Swiss-Prot record:
It comes from Saccharomyces cerevisiae (strain RM11-1a) (Baker's yeast). InterPro entries: Arrestin-like_C. Gene3D superfamilies: 2.60.40.640. The keyword RNA-binding does not apply. Ubiquitinated by RSP5. One of its GO terms (cellular component) is cytoplasm. May regulate endocytosis by recruiting RSP5 ubiquitin ligase activity to specific plasma membrane proteins in response to extracellular stimuli. The gene is ART10. This is Arrestin-related trafficking adapter 10. Keywords: Cytoplasm, Endocytosis, Isopeptide bond, Ubl conjugation. The lineage of its organism: Eukaryota, Fungi, Dikarya, Ascomycota, Saccharomycotina.
Amino acid sequence: MAPKISISLNPPYNGEFYSSNDQMSGIVSLQLTKALSIRKISVILKGFSETLTKIDQEYMFQQNGMMMPGQDNKSFHTLMKFEQRVFPPDNVWNALDGSSKPFKVKPGSYNYSFQFDKFPRKPECLKNHTAKTVAFVTRNNARLPPTFNSHWQEFNKIDNLDLYFYSFGKVIYMVQVQIELGKSSSWFKPFHKLIREIETFEFIPEPKDLIVEPDEDDNEELNAFSNNSRGNSLVTNNEFFNSSNLKVPSKDVKVVNGVGYIKSDRNFSQANSILIENGDIRSRPVSSVTSTRQSTRLVNGMKVFPSTYKMGLPDGESNMRIEVRSRDLKQIYRKDYLFRSGSQNFDKVYVVMEGNIASLSKMQITPLKLQLNLLETTTYLSQGIANGNYSSLKLIEIDLNQLKSNKPLLDLNEIRENFDGSMFECELRLKDHPILRKLVFNEEDYRHRGNRLYSFKTCTIKRIFSLQLLIEWGINGIRKQSEVNIDPVQIFCQVREHVEAEALPRYVPPPTYTEMAS
C-alpha cells in the first residue's frame, strides 16, 4: 500500500489569504503501513503563471491566403521556487557526504514541520527575460502577482464557453511534498522514484504591490506590451461590449531592443489579437473605429470625469452632461462608501448645462433610475499574441423616485453659472439618497469566476477594472440616458486601513515639594 501524505498549512495572519508579510509554514504528515526505503523528503514552495492565446482562422487566412487551423500560443513563467529538506536532518545529511544510500523507515506515523521566509516581492522569471521578451511589465514595476484562476485547472471540466476562454490565464501557488525513494536494484530502473503531494493556497500581495502602474516610456529596457482590446471574435466574453477590430496606430507603438511596447493602450477602445513579429506589429484590418476615451481635467484640486456624450435638450439649442468630481476615485477598497458624503467617490456629481438660462429654468429635468456597473478587462499574452476577456458586474440598480424625500436630488433652483456665464451647473445630490449613502463596495467579498475583486498586472496577465455610471433622465416627459466611465480604477480586495491619530496623553500636574526645616 502506498504511503499516505497530508499537508497541513498554518493559517494566514489575516485568516483569509496569505499576503506579503506571511511566512508559509506547516506540518507534513506521513503514514506508512509497511517499511519504505526513503532517501529524502523535501517541501517545495512554488508559484507559476501560464497563459494560452489563440489566433483565429480569419487572421490566418488573411496572412497566408488559405484556411488554416487556429494557432495556440503558450507561455509559462516561474514566479518563485524554494525548497526545504525535512528528512533526514541536516547533521545526518551532511554525514552522508553525497551518498545515495536510502534510509529504511519503519511503519508508523511521522510529522515533519517546515517554515519558509517571507514571500519575495519580485517574480523569479525576471532573470530569464531577454531583450525580445514581450510582457505587460517592465523590470522596475514587476511584482509578485496574486492567485488567479487556480480553480480552473482542467479545461475538460468547464462547460461554460465564456469561462473556458477566461481560464486560459492562471497564477497558481502551491506547497509540494516530494518523497525521493531509494534507487531500485534493477538495471532497467536506474532512477529514483518520486512520490508527490500538493496543496494549493491563495496568495494576494499587500495593496502597494497590487497597484497597476501606468506604462513607462523612457530609455530603460521596456518589456511592456499593453493591449486594451475590446473584441476578439474567438476569445472575447462579450457580456457588455460588441466585437470589432482595430489596427493599432504605428505612432502608438515603440520597439526597444526588439521588444514591442504600446506606449498608451488607452487611445483606442477596440482591437483584436496583436501579433509582434521581428519588431513589427501586425493585426487584422480595421472594421470599425469608435473612440470612447474621456478627457479629464482638474477643478479646485478635484479630477473631473465627464459623461461620454452630451444630451440635447428639448429647446434644440441647449445641452447637458454629467460630471463626477473626486480626489480619490482612482482607487477603491472593499467596504469603501461609494456615494456617502466625504467618500471622495460619487459624492460630488453635477449636471452641467449649456444654453439659455431662461429656457433651462423652465424645463422639467428629473433623475429616474441609476445603475452602477463594474467592468472587468482581463488580457492574456503569450508569444506576442494578446487575447482579451470582458465582463460587467452590476453593483446596484435603483429607482431614484421609489423613496420620496423632502428635498429633490436635483433642484434647478440651485443652478449657478460659471465665471463667464457660458455654462451652468447644479449638484445631483446622490449622497442624500437614503439607500445610496449606505452603499459600500464589495461588502460580501464577492468572487467573480472564482477570483476576488482586485486589479493586477504581471508578465503575461493584466486584469483591470473601470466603473460605469448610468443615469436615466426624464426631460419634459422624454427619457434619456447619461453615461460616465471611470477608466481605469484600481480595485483592492482588502479593507482600507484607517490610520487614527494617537491621542495625546492626559496632562498630569507634577507633584509639589516643600523644603523641610533642618
